[in-house]
Design a protein with these regions (language model features):
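Glycine-rich phosphate/adenosyl-contacting loop at the front of the ribokinase-like
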Residues: 1-69, 308-312
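Conserved phosphate-binding/catalytic region of the ribokinase-like
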Residues: 1-6, 198-312
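Short, well-ordered alpha-helix to beta-strand connector turns
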Residues: 4, 120-121, 179, 211
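Active-site metal-binding loops of divalent metal-dependent hydrolases
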Residues: 11-13, 129, 158-160, 250
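Conserved N-terminal subdomain of the carbohydrate kinase-like
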Residues: 46-126, 152, 298-312
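Active-site beta-loop-alpha junctions enriched in small/polar residues
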Residues: 101, 129, 159-161, 187, ...
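Active-site glycine- and acidic-residue-rich loops that bind
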Residues: 129-137, 161-166
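Conserved phosphate/ATP/ADP-binding segment of small-molecule kinases
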Residues: 150, 163-231
Length: 312
């Protein structure tokens, strides 16, 4: 693999330990930023996940899954620290905690990435729990600032988790101010702003960076795309849902795919891709990255509305 990727997602790759019954556990590779990179690669975009994983069986599984997805392996660092684990002890509703006090992800070093990578990358994505876990948090914030200064487009999905308490507030403000595209869900907003009504929280978030493009996802109700004083909305198409794991990651990835591959398209079309991507991810169990064919088959089923007109 000689060429450098045009899309990079930086953050955490982890192992979900899922409780099945009283005494049985299964493992599954995951991590929101890793999954966004995997979806982009599945859609045909030369992509990489930039992060660090343990040098053990857990890291081996993530390395294999990354290779199978077509991610550039030069961006995945292997370190002699423990793995980052998400212990999911109840599924519905999900209850979990993270194990990784001194795990490999925390020691990711951007200086070890391939020379010239930031010159080739047109978009770099940040988010997930990586931005809530020092010292990785500070490493990624500094990287995002440097990339922004160099003219690289930044996308950001906070992907709220319980460890994002008031200590995360400065990170939320800084990353929102830096980002060109921000994806957030109604549940994210209620968690991040510690509130019951997501609409005032969305307005508060947008006030930090009024010029950014916001993808606001609403689960089964679809999504909105907001830019300046304009809003587009789209209900989710009807699909046979296997589960919703990874739908948010697929949604932001599909939006970024559309912005990268058809920048001249209107916002209605970009939103179609985002909503179709999220729906396509629901067709298979687990965080299964959708194919471009699956996504494009769903595009005609996505109707986009703006404040004045309806577009079929």
């Amino acid at each position: 693999m000689s060429g450098l990727p045009v899309f990079v997602s930086a953050g955490e790759a982890l192992t979900d330990m899922l409780r099945d019954g009283a005494d049985n556990w299964t493992s599954q590779v995951g991590g929101s930023t890793w999954n966004v990179a995997r979806v982009m690669a599945r859609l045909g975009v030369p992509s990489a996940f930039a992060g660090a994983v343990s040098d053990d069986v857990f890291g081996d599984a993530l390395l294999r899954a990354s290779a199978e997805a077509g991610l550039d392996s030069r961006f995945l660092q292997r370190l002699g620290h423990s793995p980052l684990l998400a212990i999911v002890y109840e599924r519905n509703p999900p209850r979990y905690f993270f194990v990784g006090d001194d795990s490999a992800d925390l020691y990711f070093d951007p200086d070890r990435l391939p020379a010239g990578w930031h010159g080739a990358a047109s978009w770099v994505h940040f988010g997930g729990i990586s931005l809530a876990r020092p010292p990785l948090r500070d490493t990624l914030l500094a990287l995002a600032v440097r990339l922004k200064e160099q003219g690289v487009a930044i996308s950001y999905d906070p992907n709220y988790r319980a460890l994002m308490d008031e200590r995360y507030d400065p990170v939320l403000r800084q990353m929102t101010a830096l980002a060109d595209v921000i994806k957030v869900s109604d549940e994210d907003l209620c968690g991040l702003f510690r509130c019951q009504d997501p609409e005032p929280a969305l307005a508060a978030l947008r006030a930090i960076n009024p010029g950014a493009l916001y993808l606001y996802t609403l689960g089964a109700a679809g999504a909105r795309l907001l830019h300046g004083g304009h809003t587009w909305s789209a209900p989710a198409p009807e699909v046979r849902v296997a589960d919703t794991v990874g739908a948010g990651d697929a949604s932001i990835a599909a939006l970024l795919y559309s912005l990268m591959r058809q920048p001249e398209a209107g916002m209605a079309q970009h939103l179609r891709y985002a909503v179709a991507g999220g729906a396509a991810a629901c067709l298979a169990p687990g965080a299964a990255p959708p194919t471009l064919e699956q996504l494009q088959l769903l595009l005609p089923a996505v109707s986009v509305y703006n404040h004045q007109a309806v577009q079929s």
